[in-house]
């Protein structure tokens, strides 16, 4: 097989990343510059600040990715870049940089959907992984159950109707005084608590759907804390964290395994920042073993936003001749499968 080298760029939120990926599976470099410490004091990502920080660092990050991979731009076959979904200003920084690079070097430009990128992280982690399989995409801004029919063929089976999982985690963490980002902090605190101490609601839709809703459980936690505060009752934060986390993961677990049953598929690949959550990993692995369903997780560095996953997705798009024109624009609400 001929080696195809993809230079990939990711800037959809608060990570500026560039990577060099071979044939969608082998990572030669994956440079990530995170803005977490900057946004922490604001309690969340400030879009304008994120955009400015991307502008300041992107040139260095791309050059460092080429240097770490020990290749030059001449060695690159195509340039992949995230063009949605995400923050419009942040997306534009990466996209415009990639356009300029592709134009100047006469390399093909490959626009990549950020969600496809998250799913493709599993192709890096598992070198022999091939569709079909089910993917559960869980992150700060996205929650999807996706039927991966082929490398570039996706069917959204379920999605959140309100808050994404990571969004709910951040809001609950803030109410518990844990700060931002909330996911890792709740995961850590929950280990000290009783997941059955408090009964928080699990949203179930009556119609034939595998969609999610996490605004109810988030509101239930906030109401519980407010009532306890008004009555002067001391709250066990670890129990709240553990009970909230169990409520969320129960719903994710039920819907994704029901999808496997409906689609007659015995493989689930988890993706997105929340895929690093230890309780989610343990719960799905345990349930998967009982149901004889294989559960796949990328390593944590591939769960967070990174350019290696974009490079993998770009390679498979390139193989299908999904090459972008230079009038491609950033799409903050880009749907999976939209071209």
UniProtKB/Swiss-Prot annotation:
Molecular-function annotations in GO: iron ion binding; N(6)-L-threonylcarbamoyladenine synthase activity
SUPFAM superfamilies with a match to the protein in the record: Actin-like ATPase domain
Keywords: Acyltransferase, Cytoplasm, Iron, Metal-binding, Transferase, tRNA processing
Reactions performed catalytically: L-threonylcarbamoyladenylate + adenosine(37) in tRNA = N(6)-L-threonylcarbamoyladenosine(37) in tRNA + AMP + H(+)
The EC number(s) this enzyme carries: 2.3.1.234
NCBIfam families per record: gcp_kae1, T6A_TsaD_YgjD
An example Gene Ontology biological process: tRNA threonylcarbamoyladenosine modification
Localization per record: Cytoplasm
Protein task: Required for the formation of a threonylcarbamoyl group on adenosine at position 37 (t(6)A37) in tRNAs that read codons beginning with adenine. Is involved in the transfer of the threonylcarbamoyl moiety of threonylcarbamoyl-AMP (TC-AMP) to the N6 group of A37, together with TsaE and TsaB. TsaD likely plays a direct catalytic role in this reaction.
Record-listed substrate binding positions: 137-141, 170, 183, 187, 277
Highest classification ranks of the organism: Bacteria, Bacillati, Bacillota, Clostridia, Eubacteriales
Keyword Iron in record: yes
Name recorded for this polypeptide: tRNA N6-adenosine threonylcarbamoyltransferase
Pfam families, per the entry: TsaD
Cofactor binding: number and manner: Binds 1 Fe(2+) ion per subunit.
Top EC class, one word: transferase
Cofactor list: Fe(2+)
